[in-house]
Amino acid sequence: MLDIREILDAHNSDIRIIAKIENQEGVDNIDEILEVADGVMVARGDLGIEVPQERIPGIQRTLIRKCILAKKPVIVATQMLHTMINNPRPTRAEVTDIANAIYYRTDALMLSGETAYGKYPVEAVKTMTKIAAQAEKDKLEENDIRIPLDENSNDVTAFLAKQAVKATTKLKIRAIITDSYQGRTARNLAAFRGKYPVLAICYKEKTMRHLALSYGVEAIYMPELANGQEYYFAALRRLLKEGRLHPTDMVGYLSSGKAGTQTSFLEINVVEDALKHAGDSVLPNSNRYL
């Protein structure tokens, strides 16, 4: 993986690396892998061959937790709906398997043989979507994964992301908005597994696609404007127009000073109030670059 990273860096590429964990060696070295990889795929099918099958559920849960703590996307994959390769309906065990991955708070689910060569590819996708959507509604509101903040760390982005998510439990905040150049703030917000969506307004379409894997993140591309303040207000107007927000909604807003720097402030606004005073209000770092 280090060799791949070196090649990508040599070509100034921002292609992401997803590490496939398929054997005991991958499980044993997950901490080191997470330091280098951009995300992880839990390949249960291959793992089931390499390690005792009764260990797979525990390994899956451990890997998901470690990825969340590392703020890296995690995908649960293989044999999610294996029965649907040849049959139009899943087994109850498969339904429960998908739901449990959601309850463990995975970022993404993946089909393989079901859509690659199965007889019911569209039905498999629809079935997984329905099960996942219901599991999202049924999962416990209380998140049992606590992400500690290092007291010796100066990671302002992580600190403000945690405060923003915590604020949604104390105030009637309906969404957290962040303008996103590389997606780091959005991924930090995703790691805290909040109840309300993270609306990442992306300067680059590629960033929007990268964030598609992150938990609870709705990534939206919007071209750059003259400054960050105008960008924020333009985003609010667009979100209102698309029905993603309502005028009376309260939102949190995280942003930074300029590209390549960590998030530097958190604001909480009512949408209509923010837009009403858009012409005369000055946000922190109003001239920031995206």
Functional labels for PLM-detected ranges:
Residues 1-290:
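Non-catalytic helical/linker scaffolds that mediate oligomerization, partner binding
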